Amino acid sequence: MLIPRKVAHRKQHHPKRTGAAKGGTRIAFGEYAIQSLESAYVTNRQIESARIAMTRHIRRGGKVWINIYPDRPLTKKPAETRMGSGKGSPEWWVANVKPGRIMFELSGVAEPVAREAMRRAIHKLPMKCRFVTREGGA
């Protein structure tokens, strides 16, 4: 699982999920990519699940790059706890993904194989995404 080793502060404010992605909107490493169309929190488990779905489909061929990292803790208070008495403890780590962000990249396989691998990975993610190629768009 992707989790930061050391953090300056255990708890953070919730980031805004509005607006488009400022960076990471172009394919940097691979030939094919998954681009987000909505904003969402993507947990470390969802990232790992999508990675496994892709790598199992492409088998030995190809290389996968993960361009998002879950660097924000989300907190939760225990069940049946009264209101107040501080913020809850960190439960899971999320990446704040905005529309237009390239999340996963893939190269070294044919386009039909890449399209199917990415389709399987998209089903593991909590927002609408699309398959894009380096040549241009969907």
UniProtKB/Swiss-Prot annotation:
GO terms for molecular function: rRNA binding; structural constituent of ribosome; tRNA binding. Residues 1-22 are annotated as: Disordered. The keyword Chloroplast does not apply. GO terms for biological process: translation. Pfam families: Ribosomal_L16. Residues 1-19 have a biased composition (Basic residues). One of its GO terms (cellular component) is cytosolic large ribosomal subunit. InterPro entries: Ribosomal_uL16 (IPR047873), Ribosomal_uL16_bact-type (IPR000114), Ribosomal_uL16_CS (IPR020798), Ribosomal_uL16_dom (IPR016180), Ribosomal_uL16_sf (IPR036920). PROSITE patterns: RIBOSOMAL_L16_1, RIBOSOMAL_L16_2. Keywords: Ribonucleoprotein, Ribosomal protein, RNA-binding, rRNA-binding, tRNA-binding. Signal peptide: none annotated. Part of the 50S ribosomal subunit. Belongs to the universal ribosomal protein uL16 family. Binds 23S rRNA and is also seen to make contacts with the A and possibly P site tRNAs. This is Large ribosomal subunit protein uL16. It comes from Parafrankia sp. (strain EAN1pec).
